Amino acid sequence: VTTATEYLLVVYVARERRQEPVSTGHVAAVVGRSPSATTEALTRLAERGLVEVEPYEGVRLTDDGETAAVEAYETFTTLSRFFREVLGLPEAGREALGAVDTVDTVVTERIAARLLPDADLPDPAHDPPGVLVDPPE
């Protein structure tokens, strides 16, 4: 199941790597959903004030969407590194994506502070996690 957060993360990373707007086709390919299902999901995010969808143009994050996406990205990257570097999980990115909505930010802040103190968050424009960039195989 693709969550609203996953859509926000994909739009955020794509936006950082390219110019806006981000095509809905790109978002659909990365999340592994049909274009129509992706358009529906993005429309729901627009109704919540998190994105703006322009038909035949693409999608942009609103200020509220940007705030939510940055917070989710920080949680995602912290969990991804924890799952990979501490737990040794081979699918750390996928595991982190599945957990990003369920793990409290206080937990991820403690993980970052105690277990990954020297960890710099990747810059989504230059070092995005593959799970948020590449279509599923």
Where are these regions (language model features)?
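A short, conserved structural fragment
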Residues: 46-55
